[in-house]
Amino acid sequence: MVHLLKSESTALRESICAVIAGKDCYQADTLSLLSGVKIISRFGTGIDNIDLRAAQQSGIVVNNAVGINSNAVAEFIIGLIFASMRNIPGSYHAMQNGYWGESHGCELQGKRIGLVGYGNIGKTLAKRLSGFDVELLAFDKQPDYQVADKAGVQFVSIEDIFMQSHVIIVLLPFSSELENFISHKYLSMMRNGALIINAARGKLLDEGALLQVIEERNVFAALDVFSSEPLAQFSPLLHAKNIITTPHIAAATVES
């Protein structure tokens, strides 16, 4: 969208009064081209891809559609859980290379799931996971105990999330204060065989620390978001053992 806006004529750009924004970045240089725009509405929750200060200076209102893609992301995360725990991508590639053999994965039933963040997506995901007979833990700086109790979710410390969970799911909103919040300190606490999933924002997770921990220990990761997107073809994340990667598609469904 941003690329198209920059390529259009000045007259056409000036005729635009509202923008429905996706994942593209709307920085000051882009906003300066949109003199007629009065509002940018983010199709999703996070608005970290929009320069809010520049928007304010330009008199542009920024809002978001909270919860609109919660189900899409929740379902995708469940897909990543099974893809990793049952080694579905690895088995597919093995067959493509002529290898027929068993891959002994793990079942989800009875596992402990840790949600790092319990907002709209976390609550939807907890509801979807409740049918799998799992134990649900959550960490949130503003815990909603009433909703959590009804969903069978127990709030614990972030340290307990990483030490106790078989599957850890990062669901925090991004802010500059939370860059690399999921650091080596927490990643090194993961239990043997644990899986961490990030479908929130790439910059929440210290990717270098993740690579180090995966190299040293038997832990797994499934990543839909990255600190820099699109992910470079030479990125070690693409070639590291025990990591599944997808190109930021968790929210991308026809319905959402």
Identify what each model region corresponds to:
Residues C17-Y92:
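Phosphate/diphosphate ligand-binding glycine-rich loop within oxidoreductases
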Residues Q27-A28, P143-P236:
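Rossmann-like adenosine-cofactor binding region
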Residues V37, Q109-R112, H184, G193:
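Phosphate-coordination loops involved in phosphoryl transfer and adenosine-cofactor binding
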Residues A21-K23, G44, V170-L172, A199-A200, ...:
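Glycine-rich, N-terminal phosphate-binding loop of Rossmann-like dinucleotide-binding domains
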Residues M1-A18:
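N-terminal glycine-/charge-rich "phosphate-binding" loop or analogous flexible N-terminal tail
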Residues D140:
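Conserved acidic E/D residue at the C-terminus of a beta-strand in Rossmann-like folds
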Residues S91-T124, D133:
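Glycine-rich NAD(P)-binding loop of Rossmann-like domains
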Residues Q56, N63-F76, E229-S256:
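C-terminal helix-to-coil terminal segments
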